[in-house]
A protein has these predicted regions:
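Short glycine/serine/threonine-rich phosphate/pyrophosphate-binding segments
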Residues: 1, 32-37, 56-59, 82-83
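Glycine-rich phosphate/diphosphate-binding loop of Rossmann-like nucleotide-binding domains
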Residues: 1-30
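Short secondary-structure boundary/capping segments
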Residues: 2-3, 34, 46, 64-67
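Aromatic-residue hotspot detector
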Residues: 5-8, 25, 49, 89-93
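Glycine-rich, charged/polar anion/phosphate-binding loops
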Residues: 10-13, 32-35, 58, 74-75
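Short, flexible, glycine/charge-rich loop motifs used to bind or transfer phosphoryl groups or to couple energy/partner
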Residues: 14-16, 38-39, 61-62
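Rossmann-fold NAD(P) dinucleotide-binding segment
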Residues: 19-48
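Adenosine-phosphate binding glycine-rich loop
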Residues: 50-158, 162-165
Length: 167
């Protein structure tokens, strides 16, 4: 029922056709299925989340060479913007355990997402910069989510989840 509003009638189209003028590519399939021309065909400031593991749908370096305005994330730790469940699961469970929740509901997951998003915009502490051999990480194209080794995650995400669990 909820998916019907996103359905389109007509002929089947290729991934290449679907990406033309697209704002976002969200890949969760297999590596190597997106090429530089497909990224070039996207709308201005495209978002490419190539999350297939171990190899993304398009390699980070290829996407960045395709166009300078791309906002890119992968599931890999060797590139900026690693999208990985390690940012959520430990702290969602910590928050749930802290209040003895017997289930993890949508509100708790949404609270975790909002906490992670808020933390991403905060000034990055020196300990995180040092852990990643960086000088000054900050919110932007190469830092859209916190780094997995950010020690603040537990203090932001777990309490938000716990609060959502008891409300």
């Amino acid at each position: 029922k909820n998916k019907k509003k996103f359905m389109q009638s007509g002929k089947n189209i290729t991934l290449k056709e679907a990406m033309k003028n697209a704002d976002l590519f969200l890949g969760l399939s297999r590596g190597g299925i997106v090429d530089q021309d497909m990224v070039k065909s996207m709308a201005k400031n495209p978002i490419v989340f190539a999350l297939a593991n171990p190899n993304p749908e398009i390699e980070y370096d290829l996407a960045m060479r395709a166009r300078e305005d791309v906002i890119m994330a992968t599931g890999r730790s060797d590139h900026p913007n690693q999208v990985n469940n390690v940012l959520g699961f430990p702290y969602i469970f910590r928050g749930a355990l802290d209040v003895r929740a017997t289930t993890i509901n949508e509100e708790m997951k949404l609270a975790a997402v909002k906490a992670i998003a808020s933390l991403a915009k905060e000034q990055v502490p020196d300990v995180v910069n040092e852990a990643y051999d960086e000088k000054s990480l900050s919110f932007g194209k190469t830092q859209i989510i916190p780094k997995p080794l950010d020690p603040r995650l537990i203090y932001w995400v777990a309490p938000a989840v716990a609060k959502a669990a008891i409300e």
